[in-house]
């Protein structure tokens, strides 16, 4: 009889211990769970393509880049990232032609990138129309390309894989709505902030941090529930706010200074050299990870680094540079100065933002940046940006001379906006 009592006593104790263990584990997991607020994020993406600008499935402009896409180049690129930031997760995007190409270098390259998904947790996704899909295709055609391109990515990776985001350069509101409602993808790099008179396409008037786009226009933050597309619209490159005032490249002290100067490689490391280039990249990063973090309670820096750049000096010159030395310096210095910063995929970041913000009502971004002294980022100038659902506004002043602030941009979002027709 006593033995029976002991057995009855032991069973409840073991259950209680199990419950205690589970609760402890859940508590630890909750503490470790990544949140948007309180963190600094870097999202780093790359593009695998065949031609410089692939305007449609079978048409393209610019240079044939097939000779500078190789598994060796991709391996060197990915190992540089892992050595500089162990555990970093990046996003790979493939163009239509890069998914279809059966030449050995592309077959092997696709296999290698799939192995990085398995090894590092990298995201693999699709790039429609070489950043400018809507300039060369109807919205209906872009939707077809998105559907079939994403299918090809899933088949390439296998195991029911599905990316959380798409890289698109610029993407019309209707196409972002299609992604959310038909493809179940709620994150899109569908906006290149303040890109004007650069490359083959423009997009001007948006805010630079994440937002839900309006059904009227991809650059306009949604004004309400009926207007909102449930697809987090992301910028492609974090730029120096001061340098971005200039619409076209200018030569300053013999250096070609582009308006896209910030953390992208072409306008910094490749044109200006490693020392000056990384100095600008870190100055732009600090504007977000220091002052921006204090103002917004989180910070985000993002860059798309085309895979072709690893060997692009063979075609475009770039003074013989591939930028990997600068990439290593930049990533290592970020980790040294902001050791708690997270490098996660574009899809992961967008979904964290989506968890925090259910609409645009409470977004209230503020930025303050003083010039780096490089190119158009004048050392004596200070710019302030205010960005929310209702408007964006920029104030400029000479902080060394303590001059009054000058209003240089005020864009209202309560006004109707219309995208160009197909």
Where are these regions (language model features)?
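Active-site beta->alpha N-cap acidic-glycine motif
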Residues: 32-112, 297-302, 309-310, 381-389, ...
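Well-ordered, non-membrane alpha-helical segments in soluble/globular domains
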Residues: 63-79, 104-113, 140-149, 274-291, ...
